[in-house]
C-alpha cells in the first residue's frame, strides 16, 4: 500500500521521507525500495513523536516546507502543489474536505463533532475553516521550528491542537479544498470509542483557547482605554 503512494509522489520529484514509527511489517523496506528516505523509530512514539521526527529531519536537510501525506492513499499527491502554493500567504495550510470539492461524507456524531470543532477554530483564528481534523497539511518555514519542538503528542493533537498551537504563536492558518480518496488499506489508528474521547478532549482544548482569546482581547481593550 505505501509503495503505491510513494510511486505517485515520486512522479512529482519531491524529496519524500517516511517515518516508520516502530512498525513490525515491511513498511521501511517498501519505502526504501520506492526511493524514499526512511527514519525508523525503534519503538512506537505515537503520532506526535513521529511528526516531530519528520519536522526535525526536514529542518536538518535544509527544507523550508513540509507536506504531511497519509500512507493509506486518502491524500492525493496531485493536490500537494496546491497546498505548497497556498504557503505563499499562510504558515499552515489544511487540505480541507467539506469545502466544495469531492464527495467525502461523514455521518452521525463524528460529523457533528467535526462541525463543532471547525466552527470553534474558525472563531478562534478568525478564518473560515471547514475541516480542522484533516491530516493533509502543509507547514511553512515559520511553523517548522515550532512544530519540531512542540508538536502535540496525542491523537487529534496532530490536527486540532496543532492549529491552536500555531494560532497562539501568531501564525497564519488557511485551507484549500481537496478531494479525499477512499482508504486504500490499513485501519484507523483509534477505535470509535477512543476517537470519541479524543474529540471531546479536543473540544475542551478549543473551549479553553477561545476563553483565553476573549480574556486577551478584553485585556487589550482595557489597556487601550487607559492609554
Which residues fall in each region the model found?
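Acceptor/aglycone-binding surface of glycosyltransferases and processive sugar-polymer synthases
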Residues: 37, 41-60, 77-156, 182-200, ...
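Short beta-strand-to-loop acidic/aromatic patch adjacent to the donor-nucleotide binding site
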Residues: 63-74
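Catalytic donor-sugar/metal-binding loop of nucleotide-sugar-dependent glycosyltransferases
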Residues: 128, 154, 163-181
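A short amphipathic helical element positioned immediately N-terminal to and/or at the very start
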Residues: 196-210
Amino acid at each position: 500500500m505505501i509503495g503505491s503512494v510513494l510511486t505517485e509522489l515520486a512522479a512529482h520529484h519531491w524529496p519524500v521521507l517516511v517515518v516508520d514509527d516502530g512498525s513490525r511489517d515491511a513498511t521501511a523496506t517498501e519505502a526504501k525500495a520506492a526511493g524514499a528516505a526512511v527514519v525508523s523509530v525503534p519503538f512506537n512514539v505515537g503520532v506526535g513523536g513521529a511528526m516531530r521526527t519528520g519536522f526535525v529531519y526536514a529542518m536538518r536537510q535544509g527544507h523550508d516546507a513540509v507536506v504531511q501525506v497519509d500512507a493509506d492513499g486518502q491524500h492525493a499527491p496531485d493536490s500537494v502543489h496546491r497546498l505548497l502554493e497556498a504557503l505563499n500567504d499562510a504558515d499552515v495550510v489544511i487540505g480541507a474536505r467539506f469545502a466544495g470539492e469531492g464527495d467525502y461524507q461523514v455521518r452521525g456524531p463524528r460529523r457533528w463533532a467535526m462541525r463543532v470543532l471547525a466552527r470553534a477554530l474558525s472563531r478562534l483564528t478568525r478564518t473560515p475553516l471547514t475541516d480542522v481534523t484533516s491530516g493533509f497539511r502543509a507547514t511553512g518555514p515559520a511553523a517548522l521550528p515550532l512544530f519540531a519542538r512542540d508538536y502535540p503528542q496525542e491523537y487529534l493533537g496532530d490536527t486540532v491542537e496543532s492549529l491552536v498551537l500555531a494560532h497562539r504563536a501568531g501564525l497564519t492558518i488557511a485551507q484549500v479544498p481537496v478531494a479525499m480518496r477512499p482508504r486504500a488499506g490499513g485501519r484507523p489508528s483509534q477505535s470509535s470509542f477512543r476517537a470519541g474521547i479524543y474529540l471531546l478532549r479536543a473540544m475542551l482544548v478549543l473551549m479553553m483557547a477561545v476563553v483565553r482569546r476573549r480574556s486577551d482581547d478584553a485585556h487589550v481593550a482595557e489597556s487601550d482605554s487607559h492609554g
